[in-house]
């Protein structure tokens, strides 16, 4: 058992560093997307850089381009928050005596709630950008599934924390 926990701690220590770097890259991507969007709105000219960044050619009209930009900002923000939060969970696991803590459970609930709310936002934005219904529903169900799985993992982590506390009090 000791070898398993020490291996987990070591992997989580390195993974948390990778997650921190990835989270920063995603956060910078959010800032770049917002900046390109603001510049495009101020100048009234949607730049080719923004269009290639969000994956559109510019023929769709302002409403769709704004919605596509918002969709990209949302997706990058979700990714950034997820990666940073999972990095915090891994950092906690690398430092604590048990991976099962209330704080880690709360972090997993946070991710679950973000994905739950985002599933509806992405569905709405998908229809605004005139994505095919099957694509929008697939994205909706995918993010909803992630939300449910993360919530179940949070409940398991919380239950593990309770069992760990009872075990510690028994000894």
What residue ranges belong to the model's regions?
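Hydrophobic alpha-helical transmembrane segments of multi-pass integral membrane proteins
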Residues: 23, 27-30, 75-85, 112-123
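Alpha-helical transmembrane segments of multi-pass integral membrane proteins
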Residues: 118-171
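Hydrophobic alpha-helical transmembrane segments of integral membrane proteins
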Residues: 96-129
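Membrane-interfacial helix-loop-helix connectors in multipass membrane proteins
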Residues: 42-60, 125-141
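Cytosolic juxtamembrane helix and N-cap/initiation of the first transmembrane helix
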Residues: 1-39
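Alpha-helical transmembrane segments of integral membrane proteins
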Residues: 16-26, 70-78, 109-112, 141, ...
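Cytoplasmic juxtamembrane regions at transmembrane-helix boundaries
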Residues: 7-11, 85-109
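Membrane-helix boundary elements
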Residues: 50-79
């Amino acid at each position: 058992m000791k070898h398993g926990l020490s291996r987990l701690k070591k992997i989580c220590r390195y993974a948390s560093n990778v997650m921190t770097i990835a989270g920063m890259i995603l956060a910078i991507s959010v800032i770049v997307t917002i900046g390109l969007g603001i510049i495009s709105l101020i100048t009234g000219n949607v730049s080719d850089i923004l269009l290639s960044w969000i994956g559109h050619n510019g023929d769709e009209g302002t409403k769709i381009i704004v919605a596509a930009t918002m969709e990209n900002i949302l997706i990058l923000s979700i990714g950034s928050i997820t990666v940073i939060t999972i990095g915090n969970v891994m950092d906690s696991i690398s430092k604590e005596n048990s991976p099962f803590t209330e704080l880690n459970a709360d972090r997993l609930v946070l991710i679950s709630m973000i994905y739950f709310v985002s599933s509806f936002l992405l569905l709405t934005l998908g229809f605004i950008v005139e994505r095919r219904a099957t694509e929008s529903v697939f994205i909706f169900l995918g993010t909803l599934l992630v939300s449910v799985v993360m919530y179940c993992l949070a409940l398991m982590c919380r239950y593990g924390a309770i069992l760990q506390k009872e075990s510690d009090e028994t000894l």
